[in-house]
């Protein structure tokens, strides 16, 4: 008989979000950071373009914008980290509680599955014993019938 894992056992049931989903989640949590990053990148691109054209004043202006956008992005990042740090502790506690409950449920399902299998095995053993007893009784009766026939012939 092959050993199968109980149906309550599951591996990798919880999907890890892919990179794009993680990025979208972070953007929703701190929307000013990606906006600041895009503005900074735009300022650098415009500065590079104006530098290539030889427009020194515009280049300086765009680099100043870049510094301002980077500062705003950094402030948004720090402020978001502080506010999210507090809420993430609460979320972490609730997530740990959920994981604990899920582990208890899995353990309960595992035990129920083992008990069910044990009941099946016990029922098979009982049927086997009943079959053995029935065969013994039939064999005994057959031997007795043979003896009676043998004694009747003598």
UniProtKB/Swiss-Prot annotation:
What InterPro entries does the entry give?
Hypoxia_induced_domain (IPR007667), RCF1 (IPR050355)
According to the record, the segments passing through the membrane are 31-48, 63-85
Q: What does this protein do?
A: Cytochrome c oxidase subunit which plays a role in assembly of respiratory supercomplexes.
UniProt record similarity statement: Belongs to the RCF1 family.
**What keyword terms does UniProt attach to this protein?**
Coiled coil, Membrane, Mitochondrion, Transmembrane, Transmembrane helix
Q: Which compartments does it reside in?
A: Mitochondrion membrane
Subunit (UniProt):
Associates with the respiratory chain complex III/complex IV supercomplex.
Q: What does the record list as coiled-coil region(s)?
A: 89-144
Q: Which organism is it from?
A: Lodderomyces elongisporus (strain ATCC 11503 / CBS 2605 / JCM 1781 / NBRC 1676 / NRRL YB-4239)
How does this protein lie in the membrane?
Multi-pass membrane protein
- Per the record, the domain of life is Eukaryota
Outline the extent of the HIG1 domain. 4-95
Give a GO cellular-component term.
mitochondrial inner membrane
Q: Name one Pfam family in it.
A: HIG_1_N
Q: Report the protein name in the record.
A: Respiratory supercomplex factor 1, mitochondrial
For biological process, the GO terms are: mitochondrial cytochrome c oxidase assembly; mitochondrial respirasome assembly; regulation of proton transport
């Amino acid at each position: 008989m092959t050993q199968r894992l109980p149906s309550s056992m599951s591996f990798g049931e919880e999907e890890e979000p892919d990179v794009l989903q993680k990025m979208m989640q972070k953007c929703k949590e701190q929307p000013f950071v990606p906006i600041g990053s895009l503005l900074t990148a735009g300022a650098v691109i415009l500065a590079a373009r104006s530098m290539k054209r030889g427009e020194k004043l515009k280049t300086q202006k765009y680099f100043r914008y870049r510094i301002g956008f980077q500062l705003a992005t950094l402030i948004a990042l720090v402020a978001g980290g502080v506010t999210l740090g507090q809420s993430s502790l609460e979320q972490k506690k609730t997530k740990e509680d959920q994981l604990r409950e899920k582990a208890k449920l899995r353990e309960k399902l595992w035990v129920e599955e083992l008990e069910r299998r044990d009941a099946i095995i016990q029922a098979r053993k009982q049927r086997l014993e009943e079959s053995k007893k029935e065969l013994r009784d039939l064999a005994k009766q057959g031997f007795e019938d043979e003896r009676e026939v043998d004694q009747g012939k003598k």
